[in-house]
Amino acid sequence: MSFYESVFIIRQDVSLNDIDKIVDDFAKIIKDNNGTIVKKEYWGLRTLAYKIGNNKKGHYYFLGLDITGNVKEELERKMKLNENIIRFLTIKADSISSEPSQILKNQSTENTPVIDVTINN
């Protein structure tokens, strides 16, 4: 198994409940294939650098994963098929840090509430 970091952007008009369902679907795929979500972070509704379709903002979500390459391919296939996901990027990592990401640290200094941070060791 290898470590991967995946960030995906969900359309601005999707509710938090629907975002949770999307992440739960990914978690099920990972669990069914003996992988684990090491870390997950909701980065919030953020302004996009440029307009994507009709979206000027998007919900950003980060997953730190311990999975095989086949599971990565399946997750990316599901992300491509999900019309609510407007962009995603998955990269291989040497390890997954137990520290909150720099984006969450910046949000904490701005007094922005953090909705979900989970670290599984």
Curated annotation (Swiss-Prot):
GO terms for biological process: translation. Keywords: Ribonucleoprotein, Ribosomal protein, RNA-binding, rRNA-binding. GO terms for molecular function: small ribosomal subunit rRNA binding; structural constituent of ribosome. The keyword Iron-sulfur does not apply. GO terms for cellular component: cytoplasm; ribonucleoprotein complex; ribosome. Binds together with bS18 to 16S ribosomal RNA. Belongs to the bacterial ribosomal protein bS6 family. This is Small ribosomal subunit protein bS6. It comes from Rickettsia felis (strain ATCC VR-1525 / URRWXCal2). The gene is rpsF.
